[in-house]
Design a protein with these regions (language model features):
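Short cytoplasmic-facing helical segments at TM-TM junctions of multi-pass membrane proteins
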Residues: 72-111
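Hydrophobic alpha-helical transmembrane segments of polytopic membrane proteins
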Residues: 137-174
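Transmembrane alpha-helices
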Residues: 63, 96-128
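Cytoplasmic-entry segments and transmembrane alpha-helices of multi-pass inner-membrane transporters
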Residues: 13-45, 71-75
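Transmembrane alpha-helical segments of polytopic membrane transport and secretion proteins
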Residues: 170-199
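Membrane-embedded alpha-helices of multi-pass transport/permease systems
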Residues: 9-13, 27, 56-85, 115-123, ...
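Generic hydrophobic transmembrane alpha-helix motif, especially the helices
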Residues: 32-64
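Transmembrane alpha-helix signature in integral membrane proteins
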Residues: 1-16
Length: 199
């Protein structure tokens, strides 16, 4: 849920600071500062205000997910070719239409890249969340640290967490590549080059 809330808040913020670029530096700096706080310290700070349990973990995941989502949304929107946007304006498109029909589709792969990073980070934070009473796979790791010969427990908790992170990373990386607008252009230019070589 933390990553979902971060998408709901972070993507509009990323779009907003891409339109008003003077605000990009303070917004990204604040998100960067949050990111520099160690996850276990952030959980401890929030635990004092919110108590033990999953809510504290969700809020922590939300805070750590903001930076990659805001930054990638901002970067994706800013890097859209101005000539394409000018062509849209020339066709009589409004600012909202350019955003919906040009900027967001062309920056979607970059935004998904931010979500991918946020999800991988979130998995690590959720595992640590067991230390403050949130029921996760990290429970098994904690049991292992408390037992005299806990290597089996630690591996039983750590391996599934690592596998989930790897699967999500590979899946979203594949989706990123599929949605990359430059992918088709690269493919076409390679085919063109091969045809020229044959001639």
């Amino acid at each position: 849920y933390g990553v979902l809330f971060a998408c709901i808040i972070g993507i509009p913020i990323g779009i907003f600071i891409a339109k008003y670029r003077r605000l990009s530096w303070p917004v990204i700096t604040i998100a960067n500062i949050i990111q520099t706080v160690p996850a276990i310290a952030m959980l401890a700070i929030l635990m004092l205000a919110m108590g033990l349990g999953p809510t504290t973990v969700v809020v922590t995941v939300f805070l750590y997910s903001l930076l990659p989502i805001i930054k990638n949304t901002y970067t994706g929107i800013v890097e859209v070719d101005e000539n394409i946007k000018d062509a849209g304006k020339g066709m009589g498109m409004t600012g909202n239409q350019i955003l919906r029909m040009i900027e967001l589709p062309l920056s979607l792969s970059v935004i998904i890249g931010g979500v991918r990073i946020a999800l991988v980070v979130a998995i690590g934070i959720v595992a640590i969340g067991s230390f403050i009473g949130a029921p996760t796979l990290g429970d098994i790791i904690i049991r292992g640290t408390n037992s005299t010969d806990g290597t089996t427990f630690i591996l039983a908790g750590a391996i599934p967490i690592a596998l989930i992170a790897i699967i999500i990373d590979i899946g979203l990386r594949y989706l990123e590549k599929r949605l990359d607008p430059t992918r088709k252009n690269k493919k076409d230019s390679m085919q063109e080059h091969q045809v020229q070589k044959l001639h």
